[in-house]
Amino acid sequence: MFFTCGPNEAMVVSGFCRSPPVMVAGGRVFVLPCIQQIQRISLNTLTLNVKSEKVYTRHGVPISVTGIAQVKIQGQNKEMLAAACQMFLGKTEAEIAHIALETLEGHQRAIMAHMTVEEIYKDRQKFSEQVFKVASSDLVNMGISVVSYTLKDIHDDQDYLHSLGKARTAQVQKDARIGEAEAKRDAGIREAKAKQEKVSAQCLSEIEMAKAQRDYELKKATYDIEVNTRRAQADLAYQLQVAKTKQQIEEQRVQVQVVERAQQVAVQEQEIARREKELEARVRKPAEAERYRLERLAEAEKAQLIMQAEAEAESVRMRGEAEAFAVGARARAEAEQMAKKAEAFQMYQEAAQLDMLLEKLPQVAEEISGPLTSANKITLVSSGSGTMGAAKVTGEVLDILSRLPESVERLTGVSISQVNHNKPLRTA
């Protein structure tokens, strides 16, 4: 069956299958009846009134001290809970409180024996801290933690503390009387010093007033001299300033004129620039556009001429090749003809020569009469004897032609008449 407990209580289950025993602080646990056992231990805080009656201090003065301590079994620490269960399981809260009280009282007595009455009385915090420290280290082994410790009361049966209070009161009263006398003395001294300082201050004040009056008179005279000097300087400076002002006004006027002239020049320059831009817009840009157009046309014509020239060059080259081929063919034909003529000349010799001369004579006669055919006008001058008119011209031509065989003989060394006489008769 299940058992539960609050946060101020712990349960310890022992018996079958519970070795070591199970400790649960503020929770629930399952217990098998008859074969398992459950026990509870309180975790409540215990308030202890620790009284130590007539304990002799370090100087042998017996006093009584009462302290208040708060202690409890620590359930969150498993080791301390186990130690508390070993020592206090089955005991009531009163029994646990009595054990803790006896332990605290013993430590409190030990601390009192090592301190004087004055130390305990004057420094209660130190006494409380020492008791808390020593008692905590001892009670923690029992599973009990000291939550707090405070010294509540100190008293004795021999009026030792009262005597300490009287002595302190007398000392305080003595110090008060001494302080009062010293204060009165200091007040008289300060009053005498104040009176002396007052007289000294009055004398010094009168001296200072005299010095001040003297300084005032001297400074006034100095100031008067300086004022007159400054006034004269001011008058002179005023005149100089007036002259400078006039000069500056004149300079400003000149500068204004210069600025106006500069502005006029700037306006004229702007007008010139505007006219130049207008001229450029109306004349230069169209001229440049026309020049650009003409340049493009010239480049186009140039390209066209180059193409035409290249085409003509190609045509000339092809024509030249054709003419060269024709000339070559004609030369070959003439060479073949000349070769045949040479063979015929070799065979017929003088007859062939005569045949060739007779063949060329018409051409020679044509060349001789060529100048006459190209003449536009012929003027005949007669000496009065012989024929006249066309008969005269015809006679001249015939005379030239009759001299043709003689010219051929001079040129070639061949006589036409001789070759003709020696020519053999052809047989049919």
Swiss-Prot record:
Annotated GO CC locations: adherens junction; apical part of cell; basolateral plasma membrane; caveola; cell-cell contact zone; cell-cell junction; centriolar satellite; COP9 signalosome
An MF annotation (GO) of this entry: protease binding
Organism, scientific name: Rattus norvegicus (Rat)
Family affiliation: Belongs to the band 7/mec-2 family. Flotillin subfamily.
Function description: May act as a scaffolding protein within caveolar membranes, functionally participating in formation of caveolae or caveolae-like vesicles.
Gene3D superfamilies: Band 7 domain
Protein name: Flotillin-1
Transmembrane regions listed in the UniProt entry: none
Keywords assigned by UniProt, alphabetized: Cell membrane, Endosome, Membrane, Phosphoprotein
Keyword Glycosyltransferase: no
SUPFAM superfamilies linked to this entry: Band 7/SPFH domain
